[in-house]
């Protein structure tokens, strides 16, 4: 199975340019506008990230926290996010989309059900900001079996063991 994320990075490498990844929070402005915003920024992006808002986004900066708050206030639900992604992929089949968020929402939804829904919604990758190595091993394997890239975050303070 070909990874659209890998293909996007190969394409930009061959063009000798950095990849442009964009990010928007699902449900911020409205559910309908989220899809319009995602489609609009995808015209310039190699890869699009769609954040699923959380009520305690401790790993996010102020702007994303504010966006998440507005999205939750607007009534966005996880199934709405899958619907936004699915509609986006219907019109932008070759543009990779990555969902980014927190493990608590995945856990509450049910890991297996969440990953299956990602697959059915044509999600190319997942970033789960609060699921570090080695705790993410099983989740990562489940994603891989469904052809979904599990993307881990690394910072200057990340140990060599992680």
Give the residues covered by each predicted segment.
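Catalytic cores of alpha/beta
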Residues: 30-42, 158-162
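Structural motif
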Residues: 43-45, 121
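N-terminal positively charged helical leader segments and presequences
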Residues: 5-13, 35, 40-43
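Active-site-adjacent beta->alpha loops and helix N-cap segments on the catalytic face
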Residues: 2-12, 54-66, 73-86, 106-113, ...
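Conserved, mostly hydrophobic/aromatic
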Residues: 22, 41, 51, 118
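N-terminal small/glycine-rich loop or linker at the start of catalytic domains
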Residues: 8-28, 61-67, 89-100
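Hydrophobic faces of well-ordered beta-strands that scaffold small-molecule active sites
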Residues: 20-24, 48-50, 97-101, 126-128, ...
């Amino acid at each position: 199975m070909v990874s659209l994320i890998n293909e996007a990075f190969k394409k930009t490498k061959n063009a000798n340019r950095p990849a442009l990844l964009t990010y928007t929070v699902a449900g911020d402005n409205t559910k309908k506008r989220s899809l319009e915003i995602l489609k609009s920024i995808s015209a310039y992006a190699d890869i699009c990230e769609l954040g699923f808002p959380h009520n305690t986004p401790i790993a996010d900066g102020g702007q994303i926290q504010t966006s998440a708050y507005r999205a939750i206030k607007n009534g966005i639900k996880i199934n709405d996010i899958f619907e936004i992604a699915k509609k986006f992929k219907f019109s932008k089949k070759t543009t990779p989309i990555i969902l980014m968020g927190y493990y608590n929402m995945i856990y509450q939804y049910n890991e297996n059900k969440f990953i299956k829904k990602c697959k059915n919604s044509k999600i190319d990758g997942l970033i789960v900001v609060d699921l570090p190595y080695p705790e993410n091993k099983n989740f990562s394997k489940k994603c891989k079996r469904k052809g979904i890239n599990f993307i881990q975050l690394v910072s200057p303070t990340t140990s060599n063991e992680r």
